[in-house]
Structure formats: structure tokens, C-alpha cells
Amino acid sequence: APIDYGNGASDLNPEDIESVSVLKGPAATALYGSRAANGAIVITTKSGRQTPGLGISFNSSVTFEKAGFWPDFQSEYGAGNGNSSNLDQQRNYNYWSVPAANAEDGIASTGRIYSRVAFGAKFDGQQFYQYESRNWDTDMYRRLPWVYRDWYKGFFDTGVTWNNSIAFSYNNGKGTSARFSVKDSRNDWIVPNTGYDSQNFNMSITSQLNKWLRMTGKVTYYRKNSDNMPMSGYSAASPLYTLIWNPNVVDVSSYYREYAYGRIDRMYEEGTPQLLINSTYADNVYMQVYEQLNTLDRDRVFGNMALNINLAKGLTLDLRTGMDFNNEFRTQRKPWYSNGYPYGYYKEQTVTSLEVNSDFLLSYTRKMGDFDMRA
């Protein structure tokens, strides 16, 4: 299953962004070469103060997230495929065969209509043996009301993101300005046991060295750490995929109790995958988020330096060079008896990239009457 490790744009501190512009066609190609043939998104970060002096700004924010949009599931019929013609099966609709000795009412049930498809018995207030019928202390089973459960909503947490940043901006009044900023972010996402911590350090300096030469430099260091990045997509390793296949009569909290309170050992023999009810490939969703972990440690340094040279009246030369170095250490792990991995799974991956871009631009501007000529 794919893992969302983020992208380069997310490494920027929003407090450092001055402007965002879109260049199309020849304008983009002229400035950024063939890679910008289809256009370019240009993000300009902030520089130092425009007026002499020292400025300090501090920002702190907290953001809360909740899963707010849900599929439109039908809630008239319970789990089942509707194919049984056996009246005893329909009457004793259940997920577990119950011998008379373990039934609180003394009536055995052998009818088991296994299916995650939601076209079983209609929700009419009847009582059946079900997945949650077992009393774990007495090992007895009782019939429970056949009711629809919002089985997917109870899984998600309220996500919280804390952002704190401080920036210092300076201008000496003699042609030199600088800016330095620090940002710290801490996130707990809506999927349990997922989130990240990140820090961003940014510095920029601009100096008019003399009347014909100006120098600009910017550098950013970004660090991100996560003990677990969630999987996504249509795969049995994705919690969101797993939830789709849960029967609509089983509350997701049942899977949490199995995992957190040690009931897995009593429900499954050693060596048997911890699967959802009536599944051959979907793991217990809480085992997925607490033990099938995808860690990330990322360090990234990127920046640029530019010289603007006034060669003559209307004639300027821009020399630019930029560097982007990224190093990531990733791990993926699955415990014993994960579906498809009876002996577990562990993987380490180091992803390193270095990109250096340099260019120059010679431009000439001249005003002729009511017209401007640029080349």
C-alpha cells in the first residue's frame, strides 16, 4: 500500500512565504528551462525589513481535524448475502456457531451465514447470536439485538496540530537586510497512532554591495520525524480499506478490545492472522495502526544564491545557483502473523537526493518614446 511521506512544498513554512505565482508558457521556460515547459509555480519567500531596524514576530496556532464526510451506506439490512433458504439459519442469524452448553438460553445454533455484504436479515428488533455475543469471563453466549452500527465512525480520533513560529527581521539602513525564522509543528492525525513532529529553520540575506552589485542568499533546513505514517489506497494494509470490509453490525470498538485487552490470544490460535471477522486478508485494524508501523526521519537542506550585476545602463546580468539536498530514512515493519507475513516483515530504506541548478540571465531594457524594449 502507498505511504504518504509528504512532498517538497509541505516542507516550507507558510509564515515564510511572501507570494505564490503561476507562470505559463514561454515566460516559465525562459526562466526555468525545459522542465517548466508546461508552466511553473513560483513560491517567493520573505526577505528582511524594508526599513531600518529590528522586527520580531511570533505566531502560535492549534488546528483540530475530524473526519467529516462518510459514504452513504444503507442501514435497513444487516450483514449477510441473502442467499440462505434455511429458516433455522435465518432465525439464528449469527457469526459464531454456539453449542447448547455455551448458550445462555440453552438453545444451540449451527446456522452461520458468513458475509460482509450488507444484505442479511432486516433490522426489525430481533435478537441473534453475533460477533459480540461472547461473555469473555464465563465463555457463554447470549443473543443480542440486531441493530445497525456506525462501525466506521468510532475508529477516528480528533486530529490536533500545534504550530509555533518566531521570526527576526533586520535592516541596517545601509543596503543590507536579513531575516531568520524558526517553526515547530507537532501533529496527531485522525488515524490512531499516526502523526509527526517537524522543525523548520530559514535564513535570508540581501546586501547591496555597491552601486552595481547586489547579492541575495537564502537557506532552509527542514527536519521531520514520524513514528508511524499511515498507509492509504486500496490495499489490505490500509486501515481505511480495512474498515470498508467490516460488517455493519460489528462495532469497531470490538476490535480494539480484542487487541488492547489481550483477547486475541484467546480468540485466535497461535500462528493465525489477526483478521477482521469473516475475512481472509484484512488484519485487525488496531493491530495495523499500532504494530504495522511506517517510520520516517527526513533531513532536507535547500537554498539559493544570486548576484545581480548592472553592467551598463539598462543592461543587467543575473547569476543564480540553487541546491536541494534531501535524506530520508524509512522503515516498515509488520508483526508475526500479519496477513501474508506469518514470520513478520521488516524493511529499511534510505532515500538520498542532491540537485544543483545554475543559470544566468542577460537582459536589456530600453525605453523608446511610449514603448519599452526588453531582450
How should these model regions be labeled?
Residues 8, 30, 36-60, 164-166:
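N-terminal periplasmic accessory domains that precede
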Residues 1, 50-147, 175, 189-196, ...:
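Surface-exposed loop/interface segments of Gram-negative outer-membrane beta-barrel transport/assembly proteins
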Residues 155-159:
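Short Gly/Pro-enriched turn/cap motifs at secondary-structure boundaries
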Residues 14, 161, 173-174, 208-210, ...:
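Outer-membrane beta-barrel channels and translocator barrels
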Residues 45, 160, 166-170, 203-207, ...:
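Residues on the lipid-exposed face of transmembrane beta-strands in outer-membrane beta-barrel proteins
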Residues 182-188:
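Transmembrane beta-strand segments that form the barrel wall of outer-membrane beta-barrel proteins
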Residues 2-25:
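Short acidic/polar hinge/loop motifs at secondary-structure boundaries
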